[in-house]
Amino acid sequence: GIPCFPSSLKRLLIIVVVIVLVVVVIVGALLMGL
């Protein structure tokens, strides 16, 4: 297997989580703005 795969996968997972959190905050702000 590829030794760096788990570390890359973890980094990708962290990036996805951060993006989701940002989207949730933006949507929440828009909903509160409405």
UniProtKB/Swiss-Prot annotation:
Q: Which InterPro entries match?
A: Surfactant_protein_propep (IPR015091)
Domain of life of the native organism: Eukaryota
In terms of Pfam families, this protein maps to: SP_C-Propep
Its keywords, alphabetically, are: Gaseous exchange, Lipoprotein, Palmitate, Secreted, Surface film
Q: Which GO terms describe its biological process?
A: respiratory gaseous exchange by respiratory system
Q: Does the keyword Nucleotide-binding apply?
A: no
According to the Swiss-Prot or TrEMBL entry, at which residues is a lipid covalently attached (S-palmitoyl cysteine)?
C4
Major localization class: secreted
Task: Name where it's found.
Answer: Secreted, Extracellular space, Surface film
Q: Name one GO cellular component term.
A: extracellular region
Briefly state the protein's biological role.
Pulmonary surfactant associated proteins promote alveolar stability by lowering the surface tension at the air-liquid interface in the peripheral air spaces.
Which additional comment does the entry carry? Answer: Pulmonary surfactant consists of 90% lipid and 10% protein. There are 4 surfactant-associated proteins: 2 collagenous, carbohydrate-binding glycoproteins (SP-A and SP-D) and 2 small hydrophobic proteins (SP-B and SP-C).
Please state what the protein is called: Surfactant protein C
Native organism: Canis lupus familiaris (Dog)
> Gene name, please?
SFTPC
